[in-house]
Design a protein with these regions (language model features):
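Juxtamembrane intracellular "pre-TM" segments in multi-pass secondary transporters
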Residues: 1, 178-213
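Helix-loop boundary and gating motifs at the non-cytosolic
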Residues: 1-50, 207-243, 312, 348
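Hydrophobic core of transmembrane alpha-helices in multi-pass small-molecule transporters
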Residues: 12, 81, 93-115, 119, ...
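Loop-to-transmembrane helix entry
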Residues: 35-45, 129-139, 159-162, 234-252, ...
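Helix-to-loop junctions at the C-terminal end of transmembrane segments
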Residues: 52-66, 152-153, 254-267, 355
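C-terminal ends and interior cores of transmembrane alpha-helices
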Residues: 73-92, 277-290
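Multi-pass alpha-helical transporter architecture, strongest
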Residues: 85-89, 168-180, 341, 391, ...
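A membrane-interface helix-boundary motif in multi-pass transporters
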Residues: 151-167, 353-402
Length: 465
């Protein structure tokens, strides 16, 4: 019970840290001279860090140091870096200088997304059954951050970054009392292991390769949501952080339902539903944003639970089952690197470009000359932005792209029909009285043993790939 409570606290703070600034940052940064291109680089800094750091940090946790200690060091360092970034903002540093500090901070933060998963999964007996119960506290942490931002009136000012510092330092300290998650140090590390390349062997499995390619591609439109959606909410005159937190409330509900849906849908359908709802959400924004139709905007936020849980949480569990035990931290790091790293980097730059393309040049010039100390002028400029930006095109592009990714995945990700029907039978798909938490663990069988990787079809290679 003690371990469960500690792991829940870890997940709560892990996502409180992220939620405390990541969605609402543009609402403040635009007041200190950041334009659309600068914001694009702010959101590209994390993905670049995600490309560089997670595999290496995962390798350290796999081979040299207990994962919870690595997690603690990274958050303590990250808290200090976020404080330094905040000081840079206070002192009027340029957007480029601030973005450099953001980049270094994200080098410390992004690997902790995979490390927290590793610490949790290595201290549970059944990841399909137990992981959602712990991971849901991450969502609650994000929600708590959103409510704190609104209640403390931090949504559009620098205090959001101070709150992030405190949360990061707190988790850094708490990490050292988390359940011990020792490194696998039975053998001498090879150069391949030092470079964190062992996890790349997972890509030899065709089904996993298709999953990973689809994950990278779906993270391109994902960047639009994190980067732009909060400003649509603000311009619809809705409370920013609280409205954005509706997505996390739906995430809580669907997180707890994951074992139930695993038992009835299986991996492929779970992932496909997640991608399909991404396309639906952007279609809702494309229709609702131009006329400030609050119902459609809020509905687009509310479906976040399906978008995130059915694709990303399913993918984390799928990766945990595919990877041999000695490289599971690296495997989670690979997933973070290629999705929140490569995919989100491309998405951040594309979103910045598309936003600029859909913003008339006359407004772009006005935006750069706004003196945000004049509150009335600032609000007027926001309303002007809503009227002038081509929101239908801006959100229509990621909607079509997400739909195309769904088609690619559904066609390319092959399951053996015989195995699929057997799985439905075994998991109680036709038995409404079956225990979903018990049968969910069967939905991803067979579990990968060390040195063996199995495709979703049930075919196995015994060469580590």
């Amino acid at each position: 019970m003690r371990n469960f409570v500690l792991l829940c606290i870890m997940m709560f703070l892990q996502f409180f840290i992220w939620g405390a600034w990541y969605v609402t940052a543009p609402n403040f940064l635009t007041t200190i001279g950041f334009d659309a291109n600068d914001i694009g680089w702010t959101y590209a800094a994390g993905p670049i860090a995600g490309i560089i750091a997670p595999l290496f940090v995962g390798m350290v946790a796999d081979r040299f140091m207990a994962a919870q200690k690595v997690l603690g060091f990274m958050h303590l360092l990250g808290g200090g870096l976020m404080y330094y970034a905040t000081m840079q903002m206070e002192n009027g540093a340029t957007p480029d200088a601030i973005n450099i500090v953001f980049f270094v901070y994200m080098v410390t933060y992004f690997p902790t997304l995979a490390l927290s998963n590793t610490v949790a999964m290595k201290n549970m007996n059944d990841s399909e059954k137990d992981f959602p119960k712990i991971r849901v506290f991450g969502t609650l942490g994000w929600i708590a951050a959103a409510f704190a931002l609104t209640l403390l009136d931090y949504e559009t000012n620098i205090n959001m970054f101070y709150m992030t510092c405190v949360a990061a330092l707190s988790l850094g300290v708490i990490s050292f009392i988390l359940p011990n998650t020792p490194a696998n140090s039975d053998s001498e590390a090879t150069l391949r292991q030092l470079l964190g390349l062992d996890a790349l062997a997972l890509l030899k499995d065709k089904a996993y390769m298709i999953f990973m390619v689809s994950s990278i591609l779906i993270c391109i439109p994902l960047a639009f949501y994190y980067q732009i959606a909060s400003r649509v909410v603000e311009m619809a005159e809705l409370p920013i952080a609280v409205t954005m937190s509706y997505g996390q409330w739906s995430e809580v509900i669907f997180m707890l339902c994951i074992p139930f849906f695993f038992a009835r849908l299986g991996v492929k359908k779970m992932l496909a539903v997640g991608m399909g709802v991404w396309a639906l959400r952007y279609a809702l924004f494309a229709i609702g944003a131009p006329n400030q139709t609050s119902v459609l905007i809020v509905l687009g936020v509310l479906v976040h639970g399906i978008c995130y849980d059915f694709f990303f949480v399913t993918g984390q569990i799928y990766t945990d089952k595919k990877a041999p035990e000695p490289i599971r931290a690296q495997a989670q790091g690979l997933l973070v690197m290629l999705t929140l790293g490569v995919g989100m980097f491309i998405g951040a730059k594309v979103a910045g470009y598309i936003e600029g393309y859909c913003t008339p040049e006359t407004f772009a010039v006005l935006e750069r000359t706004v003196e945000m100390s004049d509150e009335d002028y600032a609000k007027a400029s926001k309303l002007h932005e809503l009227r002038q930006i081509d929101w239908g095109r801006l959100w229509g592009i990621p909607a079509v792209f997400a739909g195309a990714v769904l088609v690619f995945f559904f066609v390319a990700f092959k399951e053996d029909p015989t195995n699929e029907s057997e799985q439905a039978s075994d998991t109680g798909g036709d038995n409404p009285d079956a225990d979903p938490y018990q049968t969910a663990s069967q939905a991803l069988e067979p579990v990968v043993a060390e040195g063996e990787a199995c495709s979703v079809d049930g075919d196995c290679d015994t060469g580590g790939g």
